[in-house]
Amino acid sequence: MTPTLISAFLTYTLITALTPGPNNILALSSVTSHGLRRSLRVLAGMSVGFIITMLICAALTFSLVELDSRFTLVLGWIGAAYILWLAWQIAKSKPATGTPSVEPVGFWASLGLQFVNVKIILYGITALSTFVLPVTREPVWLISVSLLLAAIGALGNLCWALAGHLFQRLFLLYGRQLNWMLAALLVYCAVRIVVE
């Protein structure tokens, strides 16, 4: 993997992990409403579910590419298109707000959320098909990168959880500017994918 591709990979994964999504909003909302200690099982469920989902994404993406190597190119273009769509959605979105719930979500509910969380499924498929499979098809690399993707995603959830009210206030104050900056960085990622 070239330094340019690594920088695009890290930019994509960090932005995707830190931008608003079901997990991040749930983490923010749970900690804001119930405190960090009572929200640990929510964060644990998300993390375990994230690992399982990333491994499933790796198996699915690898299978498609093994079926026909042209899928790498197709998935790369689809990944670039998805990143551009994500950039547009972020650029036009309003700042995030967390809606508190009555009781904190449990471990199993937050784990189950991962299997219907389109954002992380596309995150895994896009990262693997765009940044890993064009370079190597070694199972150890696919598994390692899947675990790295899950760790980066869990780190994003933890950042939102720890930031709590402070992060929410910052999004309310500077959300538009932040969204435009993140969108521009995602456009950079998409361009690097197509150029690489």
UniProtKB/Swiss-Prot annotation:
It catalyses: O-acetyl-L-serine(in) = O-acetyl-L-serine(out); L-cysteine(in) = L-cysteine(out). Its main location: membrane. One of its GO terms (molecular function) is amino acid transmembrane transporter activity. It is found in: Cell inner membrane. Residues 63-70, 136-139, 192-196 are periplasmic. Residues 22-41, 92-114, 161-170 are cytoplasmic. It is a multi-pass membrane protein. One of its GO terms (biological process) is cysteine export across plasma membrane. The chain crosses the membrane at residues 1-21, 42-62, 71-91, 115-135, 140-160, 171-191. One of its GO terms (cellular component) is plasma membrane. It holds the Pfam family LysE. Keywords: Amino-acid transport, Cell inner membrane, Cell membrane, Membrane, Transmembrane, Transmembrane helix, Transport. Belongs to the Rht family. Exporter of O-acetylserine (OAS) and cysteine. This is Cysteine/O-acetylserine efflux protein. The gene is eamB.
